[in-house]
Regions:
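C-terminal catalytic and target-recognition region of SAM-dependent MTase-like enzymes
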Residues: 80-141
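Alpha-helical scaffolding segments of alpha/beta enzyme cores, especially the outer helices
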Residues: 7, 28, 67-74
Length: 141
């Protein structure tokens, strides 16, 4: 996944000087960043539906996403630009992402929340093949 990300950065023409590629347990990483006092202007997350950590920790998006988003708010800068969540979890609706963002990021920052489905157009039928959902908070400024 990191190699694919590096390729995308390179293909976009961006030098990547300020891009960090991190493979870690996201909750542990965010908790360390809070302790270090590090801040971010934007957060993009694409959490898995389910997973297990190195020590048997269980990740379940339906149980853990709200907590993750809330602790991520603690590492947003004073003037964040955006917070994007992408998910392919079948049991999660875009309205859930919208509500989580409204009750977390938008409560702390002035902005707007939008959500929707991610899909691939089927050329022959002009239908959309649903592939996932997104929730986005963005600054009004």
């Amino acid at each position: 996944m990191v190699d694919w990300c590096k390729e995308n950065v390179s293909d976009s023409g961006y030098q990547g000087d300020h891009v960090r590629y991190i493979v870690d347990d996201v909750v542990k990483f965010v908790q360390r960043e809070i302790r270090r006092g590090n801040k971010y202007d934007a957060i993009i997350m694409d959490p898995p539906s389910y997973g297990r950590g190195a020590n048997g920790e269980v990740w379940d998006i339906e149980k853990n996403l709200n907590y993750l988003v809330n602790i991520c708010c603690d590492i947003l800068s004073d003037d964040p630009l955006f917070f994007l969540i992408n998910s392919y979890t079948t049991g999660l609706s875009s309205t859930v992402l919208e509500n989580i963002l409204k009750m977390s990021v938008n409560m702390r920052n002035n902005g707007k929340v939008s959500c929707g489905e991610v899909g691939i157009p089927i050329t022959e039928s002009k239908l959309i093949l649903p592939c996932g959902i997104y929730g986005r908070w963005e600054s009004n400024e």
